[in-house]
């Protein structure tokens, strides 16, 4: 319950305040009560994980509006008007890069091309590596 939780709608807010919920218990399963200061509404809880880095490209409109619109563990990611369902990044960060010389080979595109908890790291070469945790 609070104004800065993920999934709370951005302003501007209506001039007429409304309280559709007072706590998370009043929302259906998978939702929580979002307090924007003037408007309390039940919004879908975001799925765990982070959105992957999204390559710029042509925008063909929104496919999803929130994580609940996406199948399985996929998340609704992207800028407004270009939102799509993506598999989330795995936790952790890529280790510092050592100098790579030689052939540029792409072994993975995203984290879910990698086994276990390994992440897809680097740009050239791009390969699966064990993550670092801060």
From Swiss-Prot:
Nacreous layer of shell. Disulfide bonds join 8-34, 17-38, 21-33, 27-42, 51-77, 59-82, 64-76, 70-85, 94-121, 104-124, 108-120, 114-128. It comes from the Eukaryota. One of its GO terms (cellular component) is extracellular space. SMART domains: WAP (SM00217). The keyword Oxidoreductase does not apply. InterPro entries: Elafin-like_sf, WAP_dom, WAP_four-disulfide_core. Pfam families: WAP (PF00095). The keyword Nucleotide-binding does not apply. Keywords: Disulfide bond, Repeat. Residues 2-45, 46-89, 90-132 form the WAP domain. Signal peptide: none annotated. GO terms for molecular function: serine-type endopeptidase inhibitor activity. Inhibits growth of calcium carbonate crystals. May inhibit growth of certain crystallographic planes in the mineral phase of nacre in the shell. This is Perlwapin. It comes from Haliotis laevigata.
């Amino acid at each position: 319950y609070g104004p800065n939780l993920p999934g709370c709608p951005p302003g501007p807010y209506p001039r007429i305040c409304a309280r559709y919920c007072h706590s998370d218990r009043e929302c259906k399963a998978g939702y929580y009560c979002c307090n924007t200061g003037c408007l309390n509404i039940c919004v879908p809880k975001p799925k765990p994980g982070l959105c992957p880095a999204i390559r710029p490209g042509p925008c063909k409109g929104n496919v999803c509006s929130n994580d609940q619109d996406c199948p399985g563990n996929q998340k609704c990611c992207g800028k407004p008007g270009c939102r799509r369902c993506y598999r989330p990044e795995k936790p952790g960060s890529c280790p510092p890069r050592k100098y790579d010389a030689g052939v540029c080979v792409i072994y993975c595109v995203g984290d879910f091309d990698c086994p276990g908890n390994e992440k897809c790291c680097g740009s050239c070469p791009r390969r699966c590596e064990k993550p670092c945790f801060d």
